[in-house]
Amino acid sequence: MKNFKEVIIIFDSGIGGLSYFKYIKSRIGGCQYVYVADNKNFPYGEKSPEYLLEAVLFLIEKLKKIYNIGALVLACNTISVSVYNKLNFVFPVVYTLPDVSSVSDLVLKRVLLIATNTTLESKFVKDQVNIHNDLIVKAAGELVNFVEYGENYKKYALRCLEALKFEVVNTGREIVFLGCTHYLHLKVMIEDFLKIPVYENRELVVKNLIRSMNFSEHKGNYYKNDFDFVDDEFYLTENKNLTFYQNFCKKYNLRFKGMIV
């Protein structure tokens, strides 16, 4: 039976988007959120744009049979640049984009954008390099694996950070733009290692969501008076590493729903 209340779907390949979920929920209360970790296709950074478009369309069709979708937040830079302006749904789609040139505070900064290979190879990022005054891009896929898989990948993450530090020192970078939602879990580690601040775009994403759904930050509180409280929910797309994901569900107060079938 379909849930009659509109939900906001937050979508990523794994746990990267959870920090976005937490931030959005803190700003827009009262709505029900459904988080989908497409772990079957992790990491997105190694998939083609065509594959990622098919993956999104397939999963949204499944979710539409269960929920009345009010909005879709693609809490992943890779899938956002891959399917940007290619989705045609009746509900709004909010993208997480490495839109360096739109941030006024970064216009005159020497910026290092770190992201996955697929993100960096996109037209969106290539346009950013051409538009921005001083933007260098570097792949940092090893950091994604470290966030998702843990200590077994730490040595690769440290090697990656060493290479990024070399780039920062030798090109005089002033700030790092996090072009992958997984990196936000490592914000303190990245800042400590590179000795420069990072920029992350959760605020831009939540403002776009508020605008696209045509409501204020506090409209969600209205729903609390009209509907019984409903748990926010969490889905996977493959039956693996269940304990890992269930622990994150507890941390973020999400009800684990298992696999989307």
From Swiss-Prot:
Gene: murI
MF terms (GO), sorted A to Z: glutamate racemase activity
Species: Borreliella burgdorferi (strain ATCC 35210 / DSM 4680 / CIP 102532 / B31) (Borrelia burgdorferi)
Pathway: Cell wall biogenesis; peptidoglycan biosynthesis
Record-stated family: Belongs to the aspartate/glutamate racemases family.
Assigned keywords, A-Z: Cell shape, Cell wall biogenesis/degradation, Isomerase, Peptidoglycan synthesis
Binding site for substrate: 12-13, 44-45, 77-78, 181-182
Annotated catalytic residues: 76, 180
Function: Provides the (R)-glutamate required for cell wall biosynthesis.
Annotated catalysed reactions: L-glutamate = D-glutamate
Any single biological process term in GO: regulation of cell shape
Protein name from the UniProt record: Glutamate racemase
InterPro entries in the record: Asp/Glu_race, Glu_race
Enzyme Commission number(s) from the entry: 5.1.1.3
